[in-house]
């Protein structure tokens, strides 16, 4: 699952507009996957098990059909990569935990603009969510 932020330019109703600079604007180059990740997605996007999902909140579960897709397929463990460790990855991990999914976070494949928040989140995944951080 490629859960990608989807925002509208200057959306005054979205809470992130007041918190962060414009990012992942629908139709913009900034919303594209980067480098080899984009290559892998383009090569595999037509496969049945590859799913692009727009998300408008921090958690990939919020306002999406992610839980339904996972449960339909009998998936019980989610593997998380991406940015930001202490924002979107964190909120997705918390929702996954609350919905009963096992969690694996790849520490070399998550990042944040806040190093302290990044390190805190990695520990939180282990100590509060029982996640594996590999």
Regions found by a protein language model. Name each.
Residues 10, 14-134:
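Active-site-adjacent betaalpha module
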Residues 1-5:
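Short beta-strand segments at enzyme active-site cores
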């Amino acid at each position: 699952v490629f859960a990608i932020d989807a925002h509208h330019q200057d959306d005054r109703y979205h809470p992130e507009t007041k918190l962060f600079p414009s990012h992942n604007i629908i139709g913009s180059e900034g919303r594209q996957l980067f480098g080899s990740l984009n290559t892998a997605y383009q090569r595999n996007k037509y496969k049945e098990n590859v799913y692009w999902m727009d998300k408008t909140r921090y958690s990939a579960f919020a306002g999406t059909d992610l839980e339904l897709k996972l449960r339909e397929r009998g998936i019980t463990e989610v593997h998380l990569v991406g940015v930001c460790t202490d924002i979107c990855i964190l909120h997705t991990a918390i929702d996954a935990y609350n919905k009963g999914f096992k969690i694996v976070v790849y520490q070399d494949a998550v990042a944040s603009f806040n190093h302290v928040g990044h390190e805190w989140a990695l520990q939180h995944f282990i100590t509060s969510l029982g996640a594996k951080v590999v």
